[in-house]
């Protein structure tokens, strides 16, 4: 059935974690009969168990549905259920590029949170029509008037015609459907006969059909049998199938301007399909791509090693399979004297890293060790060239470069007013700077801060939640690079460097971090027959030390009384043996010691 553009509405739903975005999606699917009552389950669009458990959306899930409005016309709704976390910011911005409007869901009890602010800015940058929806109005703690004021004052969105809903019970949800029809504009296009331009907003890998590309048709149309080109990557493919999401994939004869759907071609390598790329016909195609495309690069790196060397092929296989549906993360082989063979992996951010590691453990039943996360530093070499550094082991001698710069974040932290002092203190402790404050309401304040990315990697979120009694929320965006006094810190056991423990730290934090790591290792490495010094060093300078005291074998047990000189002789022999053992002995480091240091059990003091 042909759809005029006036009858199409493309929209997304944006919200802070736990404000009810996915529940509202479920209600919309139910009310438009896109999913039958028998098939409907909580969080229908969140396909991964991990998404359901954490209550977050990790992967975009588009869905098309038909709705007969009160005006008697039938409309085609295309809902793009996007991730909300900052790690997936580029994916969110491209998904928004496929929409004309957004439902902004705000919890009527919690109010505007950090992620609400960040995602609203994305929507405003994409020039979307924003429809505010106050959710959970049935809760006893709901304060509709106060939250409406916050939305007007902080987000500059007029609340002339607010929508009050309870996505859980369905109250007010039919009004949301009418608002989508009346307040979100239809797609604007050059027409069905114009050269094809389609925006790629996601892709998935199917082991039988290869890469399935999710697109929004901006201009023109496409059908099976046509040859298309991806303008940024230059890849060409013949289309075998076009289809829509309802909510599962359903083949259709053609996709036309304004529609959202999928393309199945002959591409087998997911890395060839880039989010934000423009698809056009190879023959008589568009000359100008859609604006906004750029390559995404990992910002957080860590090493992933199997607990047992026998599982190395399984870890490689697991990473390869995950990479097929998530080409944003990168990996390549690396080896460590301490941990053996493993992989150096790059991620879009901390949440992205946690998700990949958790999926390896859960979906492939693997035991892995992950080294401390690190960021990408920029070295200015003596000849003026800039070199990226994502692995402490590749850090050159300080005489080889002039300066080192680290990534900085612009962070918004929303916290209860009574916790503002503690929150400012932890920002300062992490080498951050508070640039300004903004009063949200009588009880909450928003801090505008600048923070080094390296400082929030280990336990910043935990500390933030702790000092604010679980009430603070935070969102951030990259703010470029800044010169800094970053040094490489090594850990030595019995005088030998252990490469797996090498880490990059700011010089002012090196001693504290060194003491923590030495203490953690001294507490977890069992005693040997000789004393083991555990040292932290920057270059040749030792900055921290702990000793593991030896256990003593009772060499006098076999002597029965007798001359004291005989006992002294045996003890002297033991002492010489221990000295020799200290010189040539090998320190056995148990897995628990690596895990204690590498899995972040060392917290900032």
Question: Over which residues does each language-model region extend?
Answer:
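Structural and coupling elements of P-loop NTPases
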Residues: 1-605
């Amino acid at each position: 059935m042909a759809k005029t553009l006036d009858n199409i509405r493309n929209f997304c739903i944006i919200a802070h974690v736990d404000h009810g975005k996915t529940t509202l999606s479920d209600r919309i699917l139910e009310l438009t009969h896109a999913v039958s009552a028998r098939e409907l389950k909580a969080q229908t669009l969140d396909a991964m168990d991990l998404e359901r458990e954490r209550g977050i959306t990790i992967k975009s899930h588009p869905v098309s549905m038909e709705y007969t409005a009160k005006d008697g016309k039938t409309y085609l709704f295309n809902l793009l259920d996007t991730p909300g976390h900052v790690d997936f910011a580029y994916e969110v911005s491209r998904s928004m590029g496929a929409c004309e409007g957004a439902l902004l869901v705000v919890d009527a009890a919690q109010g505007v949170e950090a992620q609400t602010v960040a995602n609203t800015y994305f929507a405003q940058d994409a020039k979307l029509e924003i429809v505010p929806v106050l959710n959970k109005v049935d809760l006893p703690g709901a304060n509709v008037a106060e939250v409406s004021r916050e939305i007007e004052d902080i987000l500059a969105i007029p609340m002339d015609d607010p929508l009050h809903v309870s996505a859980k019970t369905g109250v007010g949800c039919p009004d949301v459907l009418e608002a989508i029809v009346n307040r979100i504009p239809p797609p604007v296009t050059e027409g069905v006969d114009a050269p094809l331009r389609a925006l790629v907003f996601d892709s998935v890998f199917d082991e039988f059909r290869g890469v399935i590309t999710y697109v929004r048709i901006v201009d023109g149309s496409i059908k099976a049998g046509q040859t298309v080109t991806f303008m940024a990557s230059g890849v060409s493919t013949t289309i075998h199938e076009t289809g829509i999401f309802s909510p599962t994939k359903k083949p259709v004869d053609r996709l036309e301007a304004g529609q959202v759907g999928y393309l199945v071609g002959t591409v087998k390598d997911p890395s060839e399909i880039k989010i934000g790329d423009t698809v056009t016909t190879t023959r008589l195609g568009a000359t100008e791509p859609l604006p906004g495309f750029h390559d995404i690069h990992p910002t957080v790196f860590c090493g992933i090693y199997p607990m047992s060397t026998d599982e190395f092929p399984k870890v490689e296989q697991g990473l390869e399979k995950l990479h097929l549906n998530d080409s944003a993360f990168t990996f390549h082989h690396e080896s460590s004297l301490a941990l053996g063979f493993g992989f150096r992996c790059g991620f879009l951010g901390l949440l992205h890293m946690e998700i990949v590691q958790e999926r390896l453990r859960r979906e492939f039943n693997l035991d892995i060790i992950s080294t401390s996360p690190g960021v990408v530093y920029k070295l200015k070499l003596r000849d003026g060239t800039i070199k990226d550094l994502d692995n402490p082991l590749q850090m050159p001698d300080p005489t080889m470069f002039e300066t080192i710069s680290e990534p900085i974040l612009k962070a918004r932290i929303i916290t209860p007013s009574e916790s503002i002092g503690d929150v400012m203190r932890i920002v300062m402790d992490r080498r951050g700077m508070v640039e300004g404050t903004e009063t949200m309401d009588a009880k909450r304040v928003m801090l505008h801060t600048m923070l080094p990315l390296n400082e929030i990697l280990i336990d910043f979120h935990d500390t933030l939640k702790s000092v604010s009694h679980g009430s603070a929320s935070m969102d951030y965006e990259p703010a470029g690079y800044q010169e800094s006094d970053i040094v490489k810190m090594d850990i030595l056991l019995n005088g030998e460097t252990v490469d797996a423990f090498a880490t990059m730290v700011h010089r002012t934090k090196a001693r504290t971090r060194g003491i923590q790591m030495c203490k953690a290792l001294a507490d977890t490495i069992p005693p040997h027959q000789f004393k083991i010094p555990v040292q932290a060093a920057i270059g040749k300078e030792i900055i921290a030390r702990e000793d593991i005291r030896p256990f003593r074998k009772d060499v006098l047990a076999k002597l029965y009384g007798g001359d004291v000189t005989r006992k002294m002789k045996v003890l002297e022999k033991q002492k010489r043996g221990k000295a020799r053992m200290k010189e040539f002995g090998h320190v056995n480091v148990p897995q628990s010691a690596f895990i204690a240091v590498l899995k972040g059990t060392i917290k900032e003091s």
